[in-house]
């Protein structure tokens, strides 16, 4: 099962993420948990989130890039849900062997995220990649949809179909 942890503080303003979710919903075996809908007060139901993660084979963290990072509710979700003794540490093996895909949308072009001489997403993904590895997750190459503020509908739709294709290819490779 593919579990999409969707974290957009203003989902009604997002044309790109909306299209990505619409494409993902057309696949079998996809569950979407919209954190800002579920937890507008930031009071996360840790047991419910861990139960959802337990059912997943592929976990997707989907969100808009905010100041070169993740939205605050996703950060809190990571801090609370990926707990010691469950996701890492002594006895914390609940996520071992599962896969993680970072799916991010940006308003700027890819070159906007270069940091000095370093390709931006290689640097920006390091904290998330380190978290994944620490929890025994298999890190997949990120999916990034750039220039979402200026893309026309056709371009956004094409990129959303590419996202669906990435998910479908993962499903086919892991479940035939």
Curated annotation (Swiss-Prot):
It comes from the Bacteria. It catalyses: a quinone + NADH + H(+) = a quinol + NAD(+); a quinone + NADPH + H(+) = a quinol + NADP(+). It is found in: Cell inner membrane. FMN binds at residues 8, 14-17, 65-68, 105-108. It is a peripheral membrane protein. One of its GO terms (cellular component) is plasma membrane. Coiled coil: none annotated. Its cofactor is FMN. GO terms for biological process: positive regulation of potassium ion transmembrane transport; potassium ion transport. GO terms for molecular function: electron transfer activity; FMN binding; NADH:ubiquinone reductase (non-electrogenic) activity; NADPH dehydrogenase (quinone) activity. Its EC number is 1.6.5.2. Keywords: Cell inner membrane, Cell membrane, Flavoprotein, FMN, Membrane, NAD, Oxidoreductase. Homodimer. Interacts with KefC. Regulatory subunit of a potassium efflux system that confers protection against electrophiles. Required for full activity of KefC. Shows redox enzymatic activity, but this enzymatic activity is not required for activation of KefC. Belongs to the NAD(P)H dehydrogenase (quinone) family. KefF subfamily. This is Glutathione-regulated potassium-efflux system ancillary protein KefF.
């Amino acid at each position: 099962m593919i579990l999409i942890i969707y974290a957009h503080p203003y989902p009604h303003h997002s044309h790109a993420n909306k299209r990505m979710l619409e494409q993902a919903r057309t696949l079998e075996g996809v569950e979407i948990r919209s954190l800002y809908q579920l937890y507008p007060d930031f009071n996360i139901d840790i047991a419910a989130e861990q139960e959802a993660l337990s059912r997943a084979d592929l976990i997707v963290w989907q969100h808009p890039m905010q100041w070169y990072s993740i939205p605050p509710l996703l950060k809190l979700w990571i801090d609370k849900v990926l707990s010691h003794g469950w996701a890492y540490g002594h006895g914390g093996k609940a996520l071992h062997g599962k896969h993680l895909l970072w799916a991010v949308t940006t308003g700027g072009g890819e070159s906007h995220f270069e940091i000095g001489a370093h390709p931006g997403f290689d640097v920006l993904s390091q904290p998330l990649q380190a978290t994944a590895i620490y929890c025994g997750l298999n890190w997949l190459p990120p999916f990034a949809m750039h220039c979402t503020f200026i893309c026309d509908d056709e371009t956004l739709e094409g990129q959303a179909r590419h996202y669906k294709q990435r998910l479908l290819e993962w499903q086919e490779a892991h479940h035939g």
